């Protein structure tokens, strides 16, 4: 057999293996607009097995079980190795937040609010930071257990440190090739899953900030496809989570996708000029600041801004048509899912006249179209994303169970097996949102709706801030009494393993490696005679 024949044989064998992989139940709801042949052709000759694939499979198993049982895994944003080891005792997943990374871990060390303006390796670096810690503490624990006699081993901790990590990919940090490169970084650095949102990259905001600009549905689907394609090239089961910010978005970059048309706002006043033309003329006339704002406010008040469907309903209600209710119902039924061009034709046929509606006139000075989000808008997007996403998350303004149920019901009416995610955000005022008994059951109630994975994005940040403020304040007044009462004694009382921080850091493990190398004796063992940690032995 010639080299070319052997090369072809290897290629077709690999294509067959990929096709067989895609037949697994893991992919029963996944749509791929590309072929196994295309994926394999983009792989190198050296097959690399990524440890994060083990974690991705583990995460999928957790979520499959949760969704089937109407339960939820819940976690929070982790800051560092100390936190990840403590979380592992009680929680089955770990979250890495872009917000937290932006403020505390940018790869340039320059802190920032959550605008995703940090280098694209920032969050993958934090994932790797935690992943390496997970691997180390897993090795350390295994060594301790395997060197402990069987009859005594039950006394040794047996924590699953290898909790799957889900990380924030923001908007992908650029175009589709940037999304693919970012995905590759996450896979290489230990992520089991990543989420990506449908905001525009240059104007990305925290989900609880104002001024969010969306990209068209089709553009975000391309991002999700890019993630899956890159993961397929690497041969991993990486989970892709689609986040939509459409519930509170007010702007969109383009009208290119007809699925967005029902939510784009236009002017219904034919007697005013486009807003941007008016603003340019005012600037050229020397107006600025408050004067420009007043001109814009006056224009907005006169423009009659509304959705096209609302414009049609108002036109029918103001028309001489005899059965207005029936006409409105007929229009809404026939125009559902149609483009604005098609909806205009339907409206003209029913109302008997053209409906004036101009979505170009109110465009912002940056060129964005005005947009009216909401829960139904988010459902519209989620339904479109579902075939390309393992989970879907709607960012929301409040922890509103009724809204969460409306969203879940809307998605599941089309895709009954779609797993959902929920942000239990610290941006919400939980005390105002609901009483404590409802707070206690909120995760469970959401789990019953299909929100199989839930997370507090910034709990790592807030808990660190709270203990730091509490301790620093007491330490300034009480000296070492504050450390004893607020830190060390509670650590000992609660069995927090970091109280013996030398052992926690792996000093025994490293000593034993040195002794293994030197034949069992080391005069420089870190945990030998004289180590102060002996004070903590009972």
From Swiss-Prot:
PROSITE patterns: ISOCITRATE_LYASE. GO terms for cellular component: glyoxysome; peroxisomal matrix; peroxisome. SUPFAM superfamilies: Phosphoenolpyruvate/pyruvate domain. The active site is at residue 206. Keywords: Glyoxylate bypass, Glyoxysome, Lyase, Magnesium, Metal-binding, Peroxisome, Tricarboxylic acid cycle. The keyword Lipid metabolism does not apply. One of its GO terms (biological process) is glyoxylate cycle. Its cofactor is Mg(2+). It is found in: Glyoxysome. Catalyzes the formation of succinate and glyoxylate from isocitrate, a key step of the glyoxylate cycle, which operates as an anaplerotic route for replenishing the tricarboxylic acid cycle. Required for growth on ethanol or acetate, but dispensable when fermentable carbon sources are available. Also acts on 2-methylisocitrate. Belongs to the isocitrate lyase/PEP mutase superfamily. Isocitrate lyase family. Homotetramer. This is Isocitrate lyase.
